[in-house]
C-alpha cells in the first residue's frame, strides 16, 4: 500500500491498511497481543501535507514504545465512517484504542516530547467507566503579525 504515490510505502514499516471490514480484527489482534492499537486517519496528503510527517513518525513511536503499540493506516475510502466511530475531527489524527475503548486522539504533527508524554499518559491511565474521557491534542492557532 502506498500512502503517497512515489514517496512513502508504509508497509515497509509494518503498517498495514485497515478498512471498515478489517478494523475490528486488527483491534482484536492488538488486544490479544496486550498492545494498544494506533490507527492513522491521514486524510489526503495533498490537502494535509503534514499527514506524511505523521505517517513517518508513527513507526518511530511504535518502536519507541517497545511493542506496547500496534499501528495501522485507515484506508482512504473508510476514513469518514471510521473517523465518526472514533471521534476524529481533523486530519491527520492518531487514534489510540484498547479493549474496545478509544483512549485518545492526537491530531496533527506534534513535537516528539508531546507524543511521548501523551502516549505514556494514555497507556498508563486507568480503564473503564471512570476513565472515559479521551484526550484530544490539537495545536492552538497562533496569530501572526503585530498585536496592537
From Swiss-Prot:
Superkingdom, taxonomy of origin: Bacteria
Matches recorded under Gene3D superfamilies: Glutaredoxin, Single helix bin
Pfam families: HyaE
Positions of disulphide bridges: none
Family matches, as CDD domains: HyaE
Family classification: Belongs to the HupG/HyaE family.
Protein name: Hydrogenase expression/formation protein HupG
Source organism of the structure: Bradyrhizobium diazoefficiens (strain JCM 10833 / BCRC 13528 / IAM 13628 / NBRC 14792 / USDA 110)
Amino acid at each position: 500500500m502506498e500512502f503517497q504515490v512515489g514517496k512513502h510505502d508504509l508497509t515497509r514499516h509494518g503498517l498495514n491498511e485497515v478498512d471498515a471490514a478489517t478494523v475490528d480484527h486488527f483491534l482484536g489482534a492488538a488486544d490479544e497481543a496486550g498492545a494498544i492499537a494506533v490507527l492513522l486517519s491521514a486524510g489526503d496528503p495533498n490537502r494535509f501535507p503534514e499527514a506524511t510527517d505523521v505517517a513517518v513518525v508513527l513507526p518511530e513511536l511504535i518502536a519507541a514504545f517497545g511493542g506496547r503499540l500496534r499501528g495501522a493506516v485507515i484506508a482512504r475510502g473508510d476514513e469518514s465512517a471510521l473517523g465518526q466511530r472514533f471521534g476524529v475531527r481533523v486530519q491527520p489524527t492518531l487514534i489510540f484504542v484498547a479493549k474496545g475503548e478509544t483512549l485518545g486522539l492526537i491530531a496533527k504533527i506534534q513535537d516528539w516530547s508531546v507524543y511521548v508524554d501523551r502516549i505514556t499518559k494514555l497507556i498508563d491511565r486507568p480503564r473503564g467507566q471512570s476513565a472515559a474521557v479521551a484526550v484530544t491534542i490539537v495545536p492552538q492557532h497562533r496569530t501572526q503579525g503585530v498585536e496592537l
